[in-house]
């Protein structure tokens, strides 16, 4: 089942600080809902464990993420795949772009994911709404952490 999302968030911090935060595993771990571990394997690769509850299904995903098309401090593409045992899998990516906005930064993203297994049987409406909720939670936490507000 395909899930598509896009959006724009204003982060109350300069573009350089936002770029650094987007590449800092500790900051990302603190902001990604359910993230139990996020370890840098190389300059462009991360290993992650994320535990989520989607509807009646609880899953722990182990996966890898790769950063591509890096154009510091303006954009990158993030691609990854996670396996959650019998709960299923998720794989996908996002294009992330930053642009200066006065003393802040506009972060825009376009994300696509493919979800399979038991999770896909929950239906697209639940998966889509949960994805949007998780994205909103990430950006609220990320903005707070990066801006210090």
Q: For each predicted feature, which ranges?
A:
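Hydrophobic pocket/interface hotspot
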Residues: 18, 22, 28, 67, ...
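Intrinsic-disorder/low-complexity, polar/charged segments enriched in Ser/Thr/Lys/Arg/Asp/Glu/Gln
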Residues: 2-8, 45-47, 60-62, 75, ...
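Beta-strand/loop substructures that line and gate deep hydrophobic ligand-binding cavities in soluble
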Residues: 82-129
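A generic structural micro-feature
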Residues: 1, 40, 55-61, 86-90, ...
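Glycine-rich portal/gate segments that line the openings of hydrophobic small-molecule binding cavities
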Residues: 39-81, 137
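Hydrophobic ligand-binding cavity/cleft-lining segments
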Residues: 1-45, 49-51, 148-149
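Hydrophobic/aromatic beta-strand elements that line small-molecule binding cavities or substrate pockets
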Residues: 7-9, 36, 63-69, 92-100
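A conserved amphipathic terminal alpha-helix motif
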Residues: 116-149
């Amino acid at each position: 089942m395909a899930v598509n999302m896009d959006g724009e968030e204003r982060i109350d911090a300069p573009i350089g600080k936002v770029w650094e935060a987007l590449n800092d595993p500790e900051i990302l771990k603190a902001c990604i809902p359910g993230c139990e571990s996020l370890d840098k394997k190389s300059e462009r690769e991360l290993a992650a464990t994320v535990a989520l509850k989607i509807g009646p299904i609880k899953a722990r995903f182990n996966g890898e993420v790769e950063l591509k098309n890096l154009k510091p401090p303006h954009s990158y593409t993030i691609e990854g795949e996670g396996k959650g045992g019998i709960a299923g899998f998720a794989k996908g990516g996002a294009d992330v772009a930053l642009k200066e906005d006065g003393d802040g930064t506009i972060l825009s993203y376009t994300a696509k994911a493919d979800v399979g297994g038991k999770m896909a049987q929950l239906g697209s409406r639940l998966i889509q709404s949960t994805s949007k909720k998780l994205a909103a939670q990430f950006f609220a936490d990320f903005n707070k952490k990066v801006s210090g507000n």
